[in-house]
């Protein structure tokens, strides 16, 4: 059912573009509404209507909601971080989002860490790979290790956005990573 549900997110956009597509502010071309950043109450209403229709059509999870919600959150959070710290995360995010619009890609959201001993924060776990974390940084970027759970949506996606599953403290800064990677990246194992 997961493959058919994902396919329906594309099929609905073809059958009912008024419901399941909108115009990208970055490419000025139609995009799937799952890739759109909500800018108004009408956008939010249309997202909800599209999700309701897909629920009626599929009767199951259609696996694109976490990616859509992550993009909407990252749009504002990257801007706020840049305002406060004079970084350029928002521009990087917009460039990535534009690439996703151009390719009509599916974004899976990898949020749920496997957690281990839930009474302990990530940095106190006996196995550090029970939460996704940064293990190296260099001029090419960051390298992560760890596990995420319940990732059927990512298997059916083009890209996955990884993000923390809980509030973190300064001691857990290596676990405070949000990033995107193609689902076929070397080193990713799906079980």
Predicted regions and their residues:
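A short, Trp-centered hydrophobic/proline-enriched beta-strand micro-motif
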Residues: 104-117
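FAD-binding core of flavoproteins
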Residues: 114-191
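N-terminal-proximal low-complexity accessory segments that begin disordered
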Residues: 1-12
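Glycine-rich loop at the start of a catalytic domain that most often binds anionic cofactors/ligands
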Residues: 3, 31-38, 122-125
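Internal helix-loop-helix
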Residues: 11-107
């Amino acid at each position: 059912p997961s493959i058919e549900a994902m396919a329906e997110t594309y099929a609905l956009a073809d059958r009912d573009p008024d419901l399941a597509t909108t115009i990208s502010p970055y490419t000025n071309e139609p995009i799937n509404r799952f890739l759109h950043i909500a800018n108004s109450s009408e956008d939010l209403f249309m997202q909800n209507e599209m999700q309701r229709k897909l629920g009626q059509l599929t009767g199951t999870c259609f696996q694109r909601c976490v990616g859509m919600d992550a993009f909407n959150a990252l749009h504002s959070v990257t801007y706020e971080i840049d305002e406060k710290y004079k970084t350029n995360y928002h521009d990087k995010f917009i460039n990535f989002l534009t690439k996703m619009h151009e390719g009509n890609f599916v974004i899976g959201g990898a949020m749920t860490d496997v957690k281990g001993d839930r009474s302990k924060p990530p940095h106190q776990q006996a196995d550090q790979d029970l939460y996704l974390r940064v293990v190296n940084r260099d001029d090419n970027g960051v390298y992560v290790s760890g596990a995420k759970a319940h990732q059927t949506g990512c298997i059916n996606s083009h890209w996955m956005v990884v993000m923390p599953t809980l509030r973190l403290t300064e001691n857990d800064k290596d676990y405070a990573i949000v990033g995107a990677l193609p689902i076929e990246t070397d080193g990713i194992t799906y079980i």
